[in-house]
Regions:
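Gly/Ser/Thr/Pro-rich low-complexity, intrinsically disordered segments
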Residues: 1-404
Length: 404
């Protein structure tokens, strides 16, 4: 491992190593799974390295989760996947005393069961029978509480409902300057509690998941301030219904009907067809940080898309922050590059920036692509910045491709 005293020292060392166009090649990794690598030109003489995995039947995809977060290559080593990429947004803070029970932000469905109920409208990547699709998921639906049907809605929406969901996407992350690292992500501890209740109509109820997939009410607060991070699901509901031990079952989330057909889902976005990314609601989503997520700056980008011929693709456009020659791609450049590859049926951005990583099995060995500049920040035991090109940032969700 190579250690540095400062990020600028690391940048000077890494530039001649990493700022190089990749040699173009195309490799069949397994039946139905192909990896293509190429350096693509950008304006001003810059370039971006493109790594695209394309798959068709009989290959299958799976959405997977990790708690605690681990790196993409570590996840791949523990699985039989041919390709592993990082997935969707997750709770990420450099300084926090507590964290949510489910790290994947907003919507998370795991093994056909709800892990996190969305509190805001957001696109989702959904896995049905080994195939991925992009679905617009408004945060509302139907549930049963104490054997009675109710309409629910996310607490960050304006949807009319009988009860309102709170969850990990109510958290607030602030980006603040840091003399050592440049910036730090600070979790605002007060944001893990529900808002105050000032009338006798509502109560907040905390639920825990049970093995059969339903939720059981384990706590109640009539004045609000219920700790969302200590529960799998929190609902603000009519006080007459708020009783410990009550059974809750979620039936629908937007257009998604819960059942065995939906194996997994994670919040992602925005979709590649969104008309004006500068006005997308994710820019104001404080669970992702106080810096606008979709600012038009170059960065490493990871996207999923499906072309009209039925093929599915994962594309990582790689760069190194601060490089003039190898800066990564802007949002507009990413969309244009994807559209240049053929008629697009659907697509979305995944968690991009420093998180994006692809791990590939080739000839029995594991190779990784993307974000090879990644530095592990100083900790209590080590004050150095440690270069971890193969590992990268740990993540809480992954897309895994299997040959059948």
């Amino acid at each position: 491992m190579v250690r540095f005293h400062t990020p600028s020292e690391a940048a000077a060392y890494l530039a001649p190593i990493l700022d190089r166009p990749v040699e173009p090649c195309e490799t069949e990794l397994a039946p139905g799974i192909v990896l293509q690598m190429a350096a693509l030109p950008l304006s001003g003489g810059a370039f971006v390295n493109s790594y695209t995995v394309t798959w068709r039947h009989p290959a299958r995809a799976a959405l997977c989760f990790a708690d605690p977060p681990i790196s993409a290559p570590d996840f791949a080593r523990g699985s039989e996947s041919v390709v592993t990429t990082t997935g969707g947004f997750f709770f990420l803070a450099d300084y926090c005393r507590h964290r949510p029970r489910t790290l994947s932000l907003n919507l998370a469905i795991r093994d056909c069961r709800v892990s996190s109920l969305p509190v805001s409208d957001q696109d989702a990547l959904v896995n049905r029978d080994g195939a991925l699709s992009v679905v617009a998921v408004p945060a509302h639906g139907e549930l049963t509480l104490g054997q009675r049907p109710f309409r629910w809605a996310g607490s960050r929406t304006q949807h009319d409902a009988d009860c309102y969901a709170y969850g990990n996407a109510n958290s607030v992350i602030l980006h603040q300057p840091d003399a050592r690292t440049g910036k730090a992500r600070i979790f605002q501890e007060s944001s893990r509690f529900t808002s105050e209740i000032t009338c006798s109509r509502w109560s907040d109820v905390g639920f825990m998941a049970r093995p059969d997939g339903h939720f059981a009410a384990v706590s109640r607060q009539d004045r609000g301030q219920l700790d969302m991070f200590r529960h799998d699901l929190v609902l603000r509901c009519p006080r007459a219904l708020a009783r410990e031990g009550a059974r809750l079952e979620v039936h629908t989330i937007g257009p998604l009907s819960l059942g065995r057909s939906i194996e997994a889902a994670i919040s992602v976005g925005p979709c590649l067809s969104y008309p004006d990314l500068s006005r997308h609601p994710l820019n104001d989503d404080r669970s992702l940080g106080s810096f606008p997520l979709l600012a038009e700056r170059p960065a490493t980008r990871l996207v999923f898309y499906r072309t009209t011929d039925g093929a599915q693709h994962l594309c990582l456009l790689d760069g190194r922050p601060g490089s003039d020659a190898f800066p990564g791609a802007t949002l507009a450049e990413t969309v244009a590059l994807v559209h240049s590859r053929g008629p697009l049926a659907a697509g979305c951005f995944l968690d991009s920036g420093h998180t994006s990583k692809i791990a590939v099995r080739r000839d029995g060995a594991l190779a990784t692509y993307g974000n090879r500049h990644y530095l592990q920040w100083p900790g209590e035991a080590d004050s150095s910045f440690v270069w971890t090109p193969d590992q990268g940032r740990p993540s809480a969700s992954f897309i895994a491709l299997h040959s059948r």
